[in-house]
């Protein structure tokens, strides 16, 4: 089976938040995110095969698969958690996280890795939820969540550098961000 088409059978229910990505784990150990990788104004799928660490980009026209291309292979111990344009070059960049909470940003030009930098390390008990430009400075910021207190937080970034933080709303009892391990849950839905 062609690795670029094997993902077609995976149920993917991505949620786009202010043109930022929220990652969903899908059936079969694959993960997905959304961004416009080829600059045609249409969202494209970014897929990760957790078994091979390979990423693939599916170029879409509305809901129609147009073409596919491989992206960089992720290193062992790191997972793809999102995509946003951190260096403001007009190309989506990968956000990675490892088991210690360390984040990294891989700068891309199309599907080609052109550089990388470590981002801030998440505090224990907090999980990365998504990215969006909350303070309007043109750089994506991290959205974090802790299930212990149901508190959300925004980490303001300048490229890969932590600038400041603010607590967001506390989620009501019984509500949470979506379970990223269930392919039928919407990420970042309350």
Regions found by a protein language model. Give the residues of each.
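Trp/Gly-enriched beta-strand/coil motifs that build multi-repeat beta-propeller-like domains
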Residues: 29-190
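Sec-dependent, cleavable N-terminal signal peptides
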Residues: 1-32
């Amino acid at each position: 089976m062609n690795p670029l088409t094997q993902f077609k059978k995976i149920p993917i229910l991505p949620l786009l938040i202010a043109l930022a990505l929220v990652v969903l784990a899908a059936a079969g150990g694959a993960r997905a995110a959304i961004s416009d990788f080829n600059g045609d104004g249409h969202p494209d799928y970014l897929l990760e095969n957790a078994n091979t660490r390979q990423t693939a980009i599916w170029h879409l026209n509305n809901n129609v698969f147009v073409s596919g291309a491989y992206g960089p292979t992720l290193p062992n111990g790191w997972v793809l958690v999102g995509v946003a344009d951190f260096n403001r070059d007009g190309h989506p960049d990968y956000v990675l996280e490892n088991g210690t909470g360390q984040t990294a940003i891989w700068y891309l030009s199309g599907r080609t890795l052109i550089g990388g930098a470590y981002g801030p390390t998440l505090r224990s008990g907090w999980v990365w939820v998504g990215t969006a430009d909350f303070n309007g400075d043109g750089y994506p910021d991290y959205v974090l969540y802790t299930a212990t207190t149901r508190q959300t937080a925004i980490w303001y970034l300048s490229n890969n550098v932590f600038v400041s933080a603010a607590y967001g709303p506390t989620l009501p009892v019984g509500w949470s961000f979506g379970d990223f391990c269930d392919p039928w849950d919407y990420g970042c839905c309350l």
